[in-house]
């Protein structure tokens, strides 16, 4: 019987303990941070997957599907390649003297004049594209003794046989083709680009009919360079009804230099020069439509925003563009470590601090306070610590963009078959650069994410230490991010703790008295629920055992009779 009384006393004593915050003479204050039900996984240096409350995607993986016409000046090549427009193919006459920032070549572009080849096509195309203009100046070359302005049925202007408008086809006059020696000085202050060519007849008869001599020769010289080309007579695959060809060459004449042209036949002469400008214009092959919009960055797939530091839309770009990487996604943490709030808090539903979990629903700040006191419960954000974290995180994205956005363009590389090894080397270099940047991007983002998480954890710890130093012995650290305050602390008192104006000395005596007046054993919150349930179960079990023993003893003494009927 004494055992029953003792256990009952313990049982009642345990349940009689006053819950934190329910006693008018105490209060509970917890510190916590923002949490969301479903966070975002990011990568850090130490963890491949860590959940944060918020993250920003750093890789632009889609385009607008169209090329914006602003702020760059876009010139749509339509049916013309840049070289056809340069030479003056009849169906490209509309491009004469045009200017551009980006010349867009279409896959449907075609040549519609005399068949030609350019031995150094890529260099000429790149040179003219970067110049950004087809401005042409005619010059008065003196071609005495030959017939000028030859034409062909394969190159019609309207219904008339014609030729490239920027070139002058010279052939025999009265069965004569004298030796040609023509000079043209550059008295300007800019570089001049001269385009000229050599005609390769398909037969010896065609050669003599046009140029009298059985073999021609063309030499073009400046003080710095000399090119000599001997025609190759012979049949070639038929193109637009012709098996003969023209080879296109080009010469740059510097200011103060002289252009010298010497020929005994087969010369396709220049009519003048193109002004060469130094600039950042370029060319791009694309079939994306040109639209009325604005974008600094253009790819063959279309324009893309440049508000992200990386993109994997296309390696070829023009303008201020994000750096190309292989990854489809790289997420930058812009929030703190996410620890979703527990839905239940034991049998008491008690509040808990940041050590155990975050708080959902705290929309006005990243860090804050929850309290229980005689006036009820409440929650408020700490704006100062929130702002300190936000200020440091906000600049991360802008800094990444500044580090990675290219202020130049990555143009297409073209090489002839003879330059195959150079092309392979160029491809290897470009692929290596992309691999390095992809690795660097992943490492950079992981470092920034690690710093963000460490930073936000640090701000939480700073706020906790600041609160602990204010309360001192007036409160006890409960070990879960909460303090049990041993004096009456109304909402005004709680507010003073939050804003840093709490006066420890005012409450010191009351707190000390309340500490000593607490009765019974105060169990730690982490084990209280378990101990209460275990105590209750043991008490019930022992009570049943004692009751059963009493019944059996009474039956033996005859004080109780038990009849079992079947």
From Swiss-Prot:
GO terms for cellular component: host cell plasma membrane; membrane; viral envelope; virion membrane. It is found in: Virion membrane; Host apical cell membrane. One of its GO terms (molecular function) is host cell surface receptor binding. GO terms for biological process: clathrin-dependent endocytosis of virus by host cell; fusion of virus membrane with host endosome membrane; fusion of virus membrane with host plasma membrane; viral budding from plasma membrane; virion attachment to host cell. The record marks 345-346 as: Cleavage. It comes from the Viruses. The keyword Chaperone does not apply. SUPFAM superfamilies: Influenza hemagglutinin (stalk), Viral protein domain. Major glycoprotein, comprises over 80% of the envelope proteins present in virus particle. The extent of infection into host organism is determined by HA. Influenza viruses bud from the apical surface of polarized epithelial cells (e.g. bronchial epithelial cells) into lumen of lungs and are therefore usually pneumotropic. The reason is that HA is cleaved by tryptase clara which is restricted to lungs. However, HAs of H5 and H7 pantropic avian viruses subtypes can be cleaved by furin and subtilisin-type enzymes, allowing the virus to grow in other organs than lungs. This is Hemagglutinin. It comes from Influenza A virus (strain A/Hong Kong/5/1983 H3N2).
